[in-house]
Amino acid sequence: MTVLWFVSLILLISILLVAVKHSKRRWVRQPPSPPGLPIIGNLHQLGELPHQSLCKLSKKYGPVMLLKLGRVPTVIVSTPETAKQVLKDYDLHCCSRPSLEGTRKLSYNYLDIAFSRFDDYWKELRKLCVEELFCNKRINSIQPIKEAEMEKLIDSIAESASQKTLVNLSDTFLSLNVNVICKAVFGVNFQGTVLNNDKFQDLVHEALEMLGSFSASDFFPYVGWIVDWFTGLHARRERSVRDLDAFYEQMIDLHLQKNREESEDDFVDLLLRLEKEEAVLGYGKLTRNHIKAILMNILLGGINTSAITMTWAMAELIRNPRVMKKVQSEIRAQIGKNNKTRIISLDEINHLSYLNMVIKETCRLHPVAPLLVPREVISEFKINGYTIQPKTRLHVNVWAIGRDPEIWKDPEEFLPERFMDCDIDVKGQDYELLPFGSGRRICPAVYMGITTVEFGLANLLYHFDWKLPEGVAVEDIYMDEASGLTSHKKHDLLLVPVKSLV
């Protein structure tokens, strides 16, 4: 009888403890949330462009907003103050990444920099990339490659100018970055790969779509895969991964075959050397799949993001002739008389203050990753008095911050002068402008990305005047965004180059 009473007491205490635990959960003060639907929660409210839909919702529900996306609790922050709390004050509490099917596949089960969880492997890998790939020495070493590719591009555009034909700047900027990245990172010319230009661009676009496409598996972990099979997303994803893997293998084979005395070490050489030396990163040795995952980050991040920003910048400039004239006048006054073979250097670009303002304004209106890459909460913390619990996904709506009338006067207008006599920069310390993120998960290639955009724009604005195709007015320019992980211009930018006579 005594034993029975003792067991009953233990069970009663256990039940009470569970009840108290659940009671505490119920009374946790959570952020306000729009009403959702059964099963899908708030998924139907995201729309085609989630950052815009979430911006509208935040005006009603506040700067810290909780959504139930399928089975996944997701918090959206939409002001500089709340972004600072997430990215600085409580950075360590929410600097991991969620498990998403697209990123898992393309990153070889999270062996990369951008999408892997926060652990010792990620710390050491990021340190390696910052020190070896994105350091000033590496950036300076690829400048001759940039200049050589820019010379080819200027010659090509000059030919179009002489024939008065259109130039697709969306494709032009992407091709420029492809050629530079392939030479600087992989050590080969783009033409040395199995893919031609069009096929390669299709490969990059498809991979980015796979990263940004809606996957039911990401919101319904146990049954979502069935939906992905029926919609064909699973097959597309597998095909994209297979095509990218073939490209990585080709790059690696080329490095293993080439004469080391005739070529300078690039990043692939560095990774292959570490693999050969059985370098240890966090929880294990560097393997071939680690190398491919890192190459994925470089390929998709390095090529596409800068091209997107340059395209948006030129689109805004052609819509704002006053700004176009002003930035070209600055460049030409600083550099001097035009010359067919003249390429503007990085040192000269450092003196182009108005161009820098144009790029900041472009990043404000058109951040490449409008919701940044999602974070996952590791440990509980509070924002504005609201409790954010572990396993919650977290987005910073930098698109909403960039268009907040409480922060920016005339936020929908393209006004680079707003940055005159203003210390706000894009390097992650100013929470009003966060195109590259901030904190531990800030893009490690911020400087490389900025200099790439500056270099491309400065040279094309220096050598050419630009005008709209015949019969097209400024108001006819489509500025619609395409949906996905990155926010690129939905319609290609087609302009007519005119050789500058200045």
Swiss-Prot record:
SUPFAM superfamilies tied to this protein: Cytochrome P450
Similarity comment: family membership: Belongs to the cytochrome P450 family.
Protein name: Cytochrome P450 71B10
Cofactor dependency: heme
Recorded topology in the membrane: Single-pass membrane protein
GO CC annotations, alphabetized: membrane
Enzyme Commission identifier(s): 1.14.-.-
Ranges annotated as spanning the membrane: 1-21
Location(s), subcellular: Membrane
Organism: Arabidopsis thaliana (Mouse-ear cress)
Catalytic EC class: oxidoreductase
PANTHER family: CYTOCHROME P450 71A9-LIKE ISOFORM X1, CYTOCHROME P450 FAMILY 71 PROTEIN
UniProt entry keywords in alphabetical sequence: Heme, Iron, Membrane, Metal-binding, Monooxygenase, Oxidoreductase, Transmembrane, Transmembrane helix
Residues the record lists as binding heme: 443
Origin superkingdom: Eukaryota
PROSITE patterns noted in UniProt: CYTOCHROME_P450
Gene Ontology molecular function, alphabetical: heme binding; iron ion binding; monooxygenase activity; oxidoreductase activity, acting on paired donors, with incorporation or reduction of molecular oxygen
